[in-house]
Design a protein with these regions (language model features):
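Rossmann-like dinucleotide-binding cores of NAD(P)H-dependent redox enzymes
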Residues: 169, 173-203, 207-208, 297-344
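Ferredoxin-type iron-sulfur electron-transfer modules in oxidoreductases and energy-metabolism complexes
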Residues: 20-38, 59-92, 109-138, 264-265
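Local cysteine-cluster metal-coordination motifs and their immediate loop/turn environment
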Residues: 41-63, 85-108
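Feature captures the FAD/FMN-dependent oxidoreductase FAD-binding
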Residues: 75, 138, 143-147, 195-246, ...
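FAD-site-proximal beta/loop scaffold in flavoenzymes
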Residues: 250-281, 366-440
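A conserved FAD-binding loop/helix module that cradles the flavin
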Residues: 436-462
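Glycine-rich dinucleotide-binding loop and its adjacent helix/turn
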Residues: 122-138, 196-216, 241-303, 411-421, ...
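N-terminal Rossmann-like FAD-binding beta1-loop-alpha1 element of flavoenzymes
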Residues: 142-168, 293-301
Length: 464
């Protein structure tokens, strides 16, 4: 097979920025078969597979890419499926540039192989062309409970179901999917794709119980007692939003990004018929610089805002959001106001937001995170006229489970403490992973944690 030594990735087809910023259809349109084969041929098949070491779920990347290069897309899918329960999701939202693609040998001098784009292509091809029913393993006589139907919980559920366990997933919201459903907008991750992955788990025998808030409706002690579950995995995520603590944060027109995106993505609160309408102003400020901030800003634009600002206390080079998401936001007309930070939010006579006061920042020496610390420039305050403020400053785990589970150790941030990478908690038979342990992180890291915990839970039950 001849290698493709083109220094650049095959470009991803996308909607025109001036069209897509007015709709919620997916921005990236995906590779054609020809594009996928050509991109796959850029892989030089390193013997030590550095890309695989960068994948939290350990996909054999050179093997699946080799099958793509040969045009055997179903074989490629089977390789991915051995390690990942959500390939169509990961191909779209994982930060490949800092994981698998960040370790690609081609990336030393040129652009790395488009691993994420190829994973997405393979998953989409399989979904559109293969319609066989999944194999349902014989029940092994044991049953386990999963708390939370996000990426960690779904992965743990899938891996345990494959091993023959009777798995029940308890989800607090009215639909399964967790952050994949409520947090990531349709234009980045179509909900039909997530639903299909969930439907696949149901066909494998996984039961989903929605509207079940563990810690209120049932406790972990009850699940492991009268309900007879031999082990429990806590993948309840981190849905408690953080705020700045500045004057005016309680005004009408101030949202957490978590609330704004949940009501937009899951509840369709922007529709005129909504019973819980969301107010979208004409001038919107989103405070923060991560992927969630980009999602909130781009959603606000699509919901009718005329001007949307990203207000971030560091510079463009320090933005934690994926480079691709920043580029898409810029193309769509999002205005970046960097090196400034809000200090107060002001109200009009009716109690709605009318403006924010910001102060300019400069970067000093690196802080504990390794990034240069932002320092206020005295006397540099200025006012920005906005009518909506969305705070995107991160999230913490909800305290409900830890407060209703005696003996479950958590740290000062409210995250569940686990041993090593296996997810074992201070309570026997209770495992945890994903954002409930790490705080807000990536989808693929949560999946990796769910995978590791599922293996540990199996070993625990089989050795009891």
């Amino acid at each position: 097979m001849a290698f493709n030594m083109d220094p650049k990735k095959c470009p991803m087809p996308t909607q025109d920025p001036n069209v897509r910023n007015k709709n919620f259809k997916e921005v990236a349109l995906g590779y054609t078969e020809e594009m996928a084969v050509n991109e796959a041929k850029r892989c030089v098949h390193c013997k030590n597979k550095p890309c695989q070491t960068g994948c939290p779920v350990g996909i054999d990347i050179p093997e699946f890419i080799g099958h793509v290069a040969e045009g055997d897309f179903e074989a490629a899918y089977q390789v991915i499926n051995r390690s990942s329960s959500l390939p169509a999701v990961c191909g779209r939202v994982c930060p490949q540039e800092s994981q698998c693609e960040g370790k690609c040998t081609r990336g030393i001098k040129n652009e790395p192989v488009g691993i994420g784009r190829l994973e997405r292509f393979v998953a989409d091809w399989h979904r559109e062309n293969v319609h066989t029913a999944p194999i349902v393993p014989e029940w092994n006589g044991h049953k386990v409970a999963i708390i939370g139907a996000g990426p960690a919980g779904l992965t743990a559920a899938g891996d345990l179901a494959k091993l023959g366990y009777k798995v029940t997933v308890y989800e607090a919201l009215h639909v399964a999917g967790g952050v994949l459903m409520y947090g990531i907008p349709e234009f980045r991750l179509p909900k039909a794709i997530v639903q299909q992955e969930i439907d696949g788990l149901k066909k494998m025998g996984v039961d989903f119980e929605c509207n079940m808030v563990i810690g209120k409706v049932l406790t972990i002690d009850e699940l492991m007692g009268e309900y007879g579950y031999e082990a429990v995995f806590v993948g309840s995520g981190a849905g408690l939003p953080r705020f700045m603590g500045i004057p005016g944060e309680s005004l009408k027109g101030v949202y957490s990004a978590n609330e704004f995106l949940t009501r937009s993505n899951l509840m369709k609160a922007y529709l005129p018929t909504s019973k819980t309408p969301i107010r979208t102003g004409k001038k919107v400020a989103v405070v923060g610089g991560g992927n969630v901030a980009m999602d909130a800003a781009r959603s606000a634009l699509r919901l009718g805002a005329e001007s949307v600002y990203i207000v971030y206390r560091r510079g463009m080079a320090e933005l934690p959001a994926r480079k691709e998401e920043v580029e898409h936001a810029e193309e769509e007309g999002i205005i970046f106001k960097t090196l400034c930070n809000p200090v107060e939010i002001h109200a009009n006579d009716e109690g709605f937001v009318k403006s924010i006061t910001c102060i300019e920042m400069e970067l000093g020496e690196p802080d504990a995170s390794g990034r240069r610390r932002p320092i206020e420039k005295k006397g540099s305050e200025f006012e920005l006229e906005v009518d909506t403020v969305i705070m995107s400053l991160g999230t913490s785990p909800n305290p409900l489970i830890r407060s209703t589970t005696p003996g479950l150790e958590t740290n000062k941030h409210g995250c569940i403490v686990t041993e090593g990478d296996e997810g074992k908690t201070s309570r026997e038979g209770v495992y945890a992973g994903g954002d409930a342990v790490t705080g807000a992180a990536t989808v693929i890291k949560a999946m990796g944690a769910g995978k590791a915990a599922a293996k540990a839970m199996d070993e625990y039950i089989q050795n009891k």
